Amino acid sequence: MKVSIFITCVADVFYPEVGKDVVEILEDLGCEVDFPKTQTCCGQPAYNSGYVKETKTAAKHMIEAFASSEYVVAPSGSCAMMVHEFSSLFSESEADWKKKATELGNKTYEFTQFLVEVLGKEDLGAELHKKATVHTSCHMSRLMGIKEPPQKLLKCVKGLEVVSLPHNYDCCGFGGTFSVKMPEISEQMVEEKVKHIMETGAELLIGMDCSCLMNIKGRLTRNGYPIDVKHIAQVLNEDRKQGGI
């Protein structure tokens, strides 16, 4: 099975270790992994700001970059969802692009979704003795409807105690350009999120989107809260036993 990694901007620039963990896990599961070097931003910041023309340009570039891919996997529900939105950018008069966009959307998956729903894997042999809580991003849970895969995977991590996060599905306040356009509201939202995280007594926050984790980690650090933050790929690649998957 051939899998192309769509690394996403935030992971590529700020969390390259997440990409490495994703690749290691997929290769150990028998996937042939590649990284199309011509990939760029999916265009979500432009899309959220109303720049449809610019978004279409980015979409066309991404469609061409992953044209020969069998599967496309992203360590982000938000960016994977944007790829699924590509087809809506093109009118019926652009039937060829619309068809290509639909094909790309159909073969694009969020990382945990791919592990559970395509590969049928839940226990990866990971081990991490921590008390953790989990934040699920808006696009991943609401638009892609992905809720169970992360839960199933984390349940199999030896030594990991996962405690429920109050109001888990509330936005962390990042929202891409939202945090720039409305910083005051964004700050209030992430402050509320951090408050709920602290209520759990967890020593580790796990998430599936690097952008959310970057936003929440920033607030945790500014508030002086000693809570570690990890992407789920980092957790699933923690102390994996030889042959555990």
Swiss-Prot record:
GO cellular component, as recorded: cytosol
Pfam families linked: CCG
GO molecular function: oxidoreductase activity
InterPro entries in the cross-refs: Cys_rich_dom, LutA
Gene Ontology terms: biological process: lactate metabolic process
Superkingdom classification of source: Bacteria
Leader peptide range in chain numbering: none
Family, per entry: Belongs to the LutA/YkgE family.
HAMAP family: LutA
Function in brief: Is involved in L-lactate degradation and allows cells to grow with lactate as the sole carbon source.
Entry protein name: Lactate utilization protein A 1
UniProt gene name: lutA1
